[in-house]
Amino acid sequence: MTAPHTLGQASPADREGPVLRLDGLGWSVGGATIVEDVSLSVREGEFLAFIGPNGAGKTSLFNLISGLSLPTAGRIELDGAEMTDRPAHVRARRGAGRTFQTSSLWPAMTVADHVRLAAQAARGGSYRLWRRADPYTAEVAGVLERTGLGHRARATAGELSHGEKRKLELAVLLVGEPRLMLLDEPMAGVSAEEVPALTELIRTLHREEGRTVLMVEHHMDVLLGLADRLAVMHHGRLLALGTPEAVTADPVVQQAYLGEGL
């Protein structure tokens, strides 16, 4: 078993009690190993970013953490509770929330109704979007203001720009008040003009609201301004883990990603 190349200052996760702990996590399908022997801990309030080329296993690892896939090896703990074989909805109740590379929004539904539906699901309410008495109005308005979408409440998802859609996905996620946010390529499809505002929103959720964030992203300039640590995935394994400065300057990482732009 080969440990990842650890760089920079070590995380104090083990001392403080991690929000997330992975121990020897692996996932194989049809004889092919997709994720192999990944071990790490994430402390509360930390921002850990995952980088690596397409096919490195980053999204597959997120699927294992969120419960969309179940590992074939290893162990997962969320906030001290074992979640290795638990389904996604149990992990969500434990505080793990997830966004995806591909949007799952309904084009004809309004921005406000997306958030309202999420609030009803999170609070155990019935799915009656158009009833006269709506106990979620204040909550919906508050979440939309936090994510910069208050002025777009009545617009449909299909009318939004890519950046606004990513903000709406974050708004839907925030309704559940997740302690651990897994963001899978939130900048995908977002225009260069919209990247700074979306980056600032994610920074606010992390630093001002104190949320723990795991993020997969290919925009290195974005990650270098957000992440406390970088995790480098390579052929399904955790190649390196450390501060952004140490990881991007490391010869092992540079050799593995020669031509990948690191």
Language-model features: locations:
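Catalytic Walker B motif of ABC-type/P-loop ATPase nucleotide-binding domains
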Residues: 181-185
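ABC ATPase NBD coupling module
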Residues: 70, 82-102, 127-137, 244-251
